[in-house]
Structures are given as C-alpha cells and as structure tokens.
Amino acid sequence: MKKLLLGSTIAFSAMVVLCFSSMAFAQQNAGKEFKWPPMLRIATPTTQSASFASTNGWGPMLQAETGVNVRIVPEDSEIRRYTRFCVNKEFDLVSTSIADVGHSIEGEVGYSMQEAVHQRAVWHHNDTPWSFVVRGDSKFKTIQDLKQKGVRVALSTQSPPMMVAVQEALPAFIGWTKEEAAANWTFVPVGSYAENCRTVTDGKADVAYVTPISSITFEMEAHPQKIRWLAMPLSDTNGWNAFLQLRPTVIPSTMDFGVPSAMGVDAIASNFIYWTRPDVDQEMVYLLAKWFHERFDNYKDVHAIAKRMSLNHMRNFLNHSAFPVAEGTIRYLKEIGQWTEADDTWNNAQIALMDRWVNARNAAIKEANAKKIKIHWENQEYISLLKKHTEGIPVFKTRM
C-alpha cells in the first residue's frame, strides 16, 4: 500500500477536478444567506499523523470552493488539544478519537482537572486501527509472551487513552491486573506519539501501542529490523471482555489498511471523528456535512484514510456510536434519508448522558474550588470528591 503522505501530483489533480465542481456547489447553495466565517480553524494530532495529513488534503479544496480560510493546527498533546478546542474555543473542528472524547467527558487522568464541555460528532474521519508492536527481531512472538518480568513498555504520556491502553487494558487482556503489570514491567515514558513509536525501533522499549496508518509507522516498517504486530485474537473472548471493560469505546477488528506488516492482524479499531461544540454555528456544520458527502469523490484520493470519510463509513459509525451528533449534521442526514427515528432516540439519550457527566464534573470542580481543594488528578482528596459527584453515571460504551 502506498505511503500515507499527501502527494503533490494527487493534490494538483484534485484541484483541477475542483475547478469544475466548485461552481456547482456554490450554485446549489445560492440563495442561502449563510456567510462563511473568515477562518475555519481545525485541530488535529501531530504533523506525523494521518489525521493531519488527510485534513491538509481536503482543507485546501474546501477553501477554494467556499472562500473560507482553512487553518489546520497540529496539537500532539490530547489534553492541550481538548483545552484549546473546548475550553478556550480556539478551534471550530477537531479530529480526535472516540476513546479520547470518552476520557475527556468522564474526566479520566489529566482531564479531571479541566472544565467539562459538550462535544458533538460532525463526520467520520477514519476507523483507525491500533495494536501493540515490537521490533522484527524481538523475542516476543505473541501478546501472551509479554506476561513476564522485565518487559519494557512505551508509555505515551501526552495521551490518557494510550496510557490506559498500556498500563491497564493490555495487562487485562493477558490476564494481569494493572498492579501486576506495574510490578513486573518497566514503563518507558515519552512525551509525544512519534517518540512512542521510535522507542521500539531505537531499542528503548520492547513494545509500544501504535497505529499502522501514520507516516511514522512507515518509517518504522523501513527499519533494517522491520516491525511485527502482536495479534489480539478475536477468538480470545476473555481477553477482549477484560480489555473492553477498560477501553469501552473501541471495537475488536482485523487491520485492513496501513503498513503491509499489519494486514490481517487482529487488533483494535478506534474511530477518529471530526467533532465540534454545540455553540459552533450549526448552519456551517450542516454545510460541512453536505460538502463531506457531496465532494467525497473529489477528495477521497488525497490521502489513503480520506477514503474512510464516505457516507457508508459515517453510517456504520452511527450504528455503533456512543456519542451524540451535531444538529447541523443531523439536519443534513435527514435531508438525504440517512437519519431515522431510532437515531433520534439513541442520540437524545447520549445527549442526556453527556449532560449528566458535564454537570457532575463541573459541580465537582466548583465544590473543590469552594473548599480550596487542590484540583489535580494525583490529589486523592480531589479524586474522591470527583467520584462522589459522578458515582452511578454510566460510562460511554460502543453500541454493539
């Protein structure tokens, strides 16, 4: 499979096609009084991520058609990305995994210190596969081989979901508690996703939690020793049940895109979605959803994961989504017959669930401030207060 980088030839060809389609899109929306803002601000993960590369593929096309200045900002720290998007409102759209949105709403780890803010799904970005990777010459051949003392595990500290994946969910899959993992493994902390990946090929860690679709993964694949993926067999129901207790928004799957070494390996799918907030102009969200659907054939080849932005992928996401959808997107989906009464039912239920989490989380912060309790995820007094406020609220779970 070709390397997941935006090629200049593809981009040029896409812009040529765009010249013939932009007038049609504008004419379809003639008579609408909506005026695009001077700038559409979009946040993505690091520059070495497929999310950043693919967004830079379709962004210039949207700009050429609508006249809006599309600004794409990479932010590798997921907590900083959340704060800038939700609290500071620096962005209108953000590409983030469903796992991370779950953590940010439920106040896991570093998110517990941040104000809780409602988020809404706009469009499916990609169904990102994830798994655990070792160097090609590693002595570890199966995921169960990790169940021994002395294993060095990369710990990507900028991402709470990735930390949970390696410190808690991976041990659970192989039949350990997080305490047993802490007692037997050596965690190698790193501050960025790229560092997390390179620990394996550089020999600093034995195993890392990695997606096969990023440009950095293709660099790993090109290493003289290559890389190898430790399968998470779909037949291991005990392992998966334990894993999903800790990562309830992921989906067991078989990897079918990314680096060649990942093909056919049983692993995880954690969808990346373009998200917005309810306070963002929903007319603009409606037009974005319309553009994503109607212009799919024009932008689908700008990057390998852009093909995962089809209406079919969006509809499949909706069939399992744990999170509410933006009003503007719902309006468009209703127009094209892709939204049902059943969708309204589950969506309203998820809005109500998110409202419970947001209210409880923010009430905990308010009480902590009033009592001068230090708001920090390592302060047990604050965490106990937070648990008191959120006790009994169900977590967000993928609808199977």
Question: Which residue ranges define each predicted feature?
Answer:
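Pocket-lining segment of extracytoplasmic ligand-binding domains
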Residues: 98-100, 108-109, 120, 138-139, ...
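Bacterial N-terminal signal peptides
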Residues: 9-21
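Ligand-binding clefts/hinges and TM-proximal coupling segments of bilobed small-molecule sensing domains
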Residues: 148-169, 249-312, 321
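Pocket-flanking alpha-helical
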Residues: 54-61, 71-115, 194-199, 213-223
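Positively charged n-region of N-terminal signal peptides that target proteins for export
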Residues: 1-4
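Boundary at the C-terminal end of the N-terminal hydrophobic targeting segment
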Residues: 24-26
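Bilobed "Venus flytrap"/periplasmic-binding protein-like clamshell domains
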Residues: 37-65, 69-71, 129-202, 213, ...
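An extracytoplasmic/periplasmic, membrane-proximal ligand-sensing/linker region
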Residues: 38, 212-225, 229, 287, ...
